[in-house]
């Protein structure tokens, strides 16, 4: 994986610990029927393993470089949106979604 610099202005931090990722997913308790809104997927460390356990992930990432990186590793049930979550029109998503983020 190519090196992607952390941008402090967006408060970026990237999870690298697989045990922590597994713990977050376990506590989140995903279901195959779930639609998940992920805030700040970053490099996809949480996104990709979670995508195997839910119906769909809508991942909103502000950093266009990270969006490009995520698109290189396309997975069908992940919808990537390059936007600021504070401006994102979440009403465009059907009701009943869950929210996750490594903030």
Regions found by a protein language model. Name each.
Residues 1-103:
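Catalytic cores of RNA-modifying enzymes
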């Amino acid at each position: 994986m190519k090196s992607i610099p952390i941008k402090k202005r967006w408060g970026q931090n990237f999870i690298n610990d697989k045990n922590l990722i597994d713990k977050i997913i376990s506590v989140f308790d995903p279901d195959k029927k779930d639609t998940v809104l992920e805030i700040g997927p970053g490099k996809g460390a949480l996104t990709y393993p979670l995508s195997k356990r839910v119906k769909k992930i809508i991942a909103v990432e502000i950093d266009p470089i990270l969006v490009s990186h995520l698109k290189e590793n396309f997975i069908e049930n992940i919808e990537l949106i390059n936007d600021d979550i504070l401006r994102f029109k979440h009403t465009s998503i059907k009701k009943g979604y869950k929210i996750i983020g490594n903030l």
